Design a protein with these regions (language model features):
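Conserved short histidine dyad/triad with adjacent acidic residue
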Residues: 17-34, 68
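A short, N-terminal "cap"/entry segment at the start of jelly-roll beta-barrel domains
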Residues: 1-20, 30, 96-100
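Short, charged/polar surface micro-motifs in flexible loops or helix N-caps
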Residues: 25, 44-48, 55, 89-92
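Short histidine-centered beta-strand/loop micro-motifs
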Residues: 7, 28-34, 51, 75-76
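Short acidic-glycine-tyrosine-enriched beta hairpin
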Residues: 52-68
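Ligand-binding loop in jelly-roll beta-barrel domains
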Residues: 68-93
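Short, conserved beta-strand element in jelly-roll/cupin
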Residues: 22, 33-49
Length: 100
């Protein structure tokens, strides 16, 4: 899917906060959760997400989703990663201080 089409689909589905992210090789983010849903399209490179002990790698052309409140860890591949991400606030979790 082309990034322009992906961005249109994000907006259609209520993912109003959209940005292109570029993360450096080897970057790691410890387990955390967000107060919003995430949908992302990998444009280049690789990112690995670990949820409940299961790790999955996403590469160019792959789409990943992360519902609000799901704890996960992130690990960027050896060449970094470039992806287009949309965030959709969820009313029940948007103001929950435990979901950061």
């Amino acid at each position: 899917m082309k990034d322009e089409h992906f961005e249109c689909a994000l907006r259609r589905d209520g993912f109003d906060d959209i940005e292109r992210k570029n993360l450096p090789p080897g970057m790691r983010v410890p387990e955390h959760a967000h107060p919003f849903d995430i949908r992302a399209l990998v444009l280049e490179g690789e990112i690995r997400l670990t949820v409940e002990g299961d790790e999955h790698a996403y590469r160019e052309g792959d789409i990943f989703v992360m519902p609000a409140g799901h704890r996960h860890a992130e690990a960027v591949g050896p060449d970094g990663v470039d992806y287009l991400v949309g965030r959709r606030k969820t009313p029940a979790l948007a103001n929950d201080p435990l979901r950061t």
